[in-house]
Amino acid sequence: MGNGVQPLDPVAIQMGSLSVKWYGVIIASAVVIALLLALSEANKRKMDKEIIVDLLIWAIPISIISARIYYVIFEWDFYKNNLGEIIKIWHGGIAIYGALIGAVLTAIIFSRVKKISFWQLADVVAPSLIIAQAIGRWGNFMNQEAHGAETTRAFLEGLHLPEFIINQMFIDGIYYQPTFLYESLWNVLGFILLLIIRRTKIRSGELFLSYVIWYSFGRFFIEGMRTDSLMWGDFRVSQVLSLLLIVLSIGLIIYRRLKMNPPYYMEDKFGKVAKKK
C-alpha cells in the first residue's frame, strides 16, 4: 500500500481455512457487555434477570434478520438480479437501524406475551443498546468501512488521533474521515447522559425515548459525512429515519405526559403484569 501504511489485519484468529474476524469478535464482545449491563440494571429495578436473557435469545437472531432485510430493501437494484446473495450475510450488508427496528418489535411482542411493561423493559436495556453500538462501530473500523469522505493526513493529525487510527483510515491511497469514531464517541457520550438523566425526574419510558432522540440526532449529522449511505431517491435513508424518530419520540414524551401520566422512572417498580398507563 502507498506511503508504506499497512492496515490492521481484519482477521483475529486463523485456523486452517477457518478465519475469525475482528468484526465478529468486537460485535460478540459488545453483546456480552450489553447483556451484563442490562442484567445489572434489571437487578437494580427488581426485574427477573431471566426476562433479559429470554429477550436476548429472541432479539439477537431477529435483529440480524431485520438488519439484513432493511439493507436488501434499499439495495434492491443489486439484489433483484442477484437473489442468491440475499442470504449471504457474511459478504456484508446489514444496517443498524434495521437491527434496532427488529429489536424494538421483538421487545413489544415479548412484553405482551410476558405481560410486562414494554416501557420498563425498554428503559432497562436503553443504556446497554447505546454502549453496544459504541463498541460495535470499532468492528467497522477493523473492516475499513462506514467511513466518511476523503480528507488529508494533516486533518486527521489535527484531531490528535492515535497513529493506528490515522493509518487505518488510509484506504487505497486515500485518507478518509473516521465517521465510525465520531459515532462511537457520540454514543459513549449518550451512555453517560443516560446514566445521569435516569436519576432525574423523568417518567417511565423516557430513558429509552431519550436514547432514541440522542442517537438519531447524532446519526443524522454523521450520516451526512458518510460515503456508503443507503439511498431512497435523492435522500439518505438513515437521515430521513433519524428525523422521523426524533419527532416521534418527542411526540410520545409529550403525549404520554399529557394523556397517560406515567410514573416517575425511579418510582416505577417493576411488576409482572404491566399496568395501563
Swiss-Prot record:
Coiled-coil regions listed = none
Compartment annotation = Cell membrane
Which HAMAP family has this protein been placed in? Lgt
What superkingdom heads the lineage? Answer: Bacteria
A biological process (GO) annotation for this entry?
lipoprotein biosynthetic process
Could you tell me what this protein does?
A: Catalyzes the transfer of the diacylglyceryl group from phosphatidylglycerol to the sulfhydryl group of the N-terminal cysteine of a prolipoprotein, the first step in the formation of mature lipoproteins.
Chain residues that bind a 1,2-diacyl-sn-glycero-3-phospho-(1'-sn-glycerol): R137
Question: What InterPro entries does this protein map onto?
Answer: Lgt (IPR001640)
Name this polypeptide is given: Phosphatidylglycerol--prolipoprotein diacylglyceryl transferase
Q: Topology with regard to the membrane?
A: Multi-pass membrane protein
Which E.C. number(s) belong to this protein?
Answer: 2.5.1.145
Associated pathway: Protein modification; lipoprotein biosynthesis (diacylglyceryl transfer)
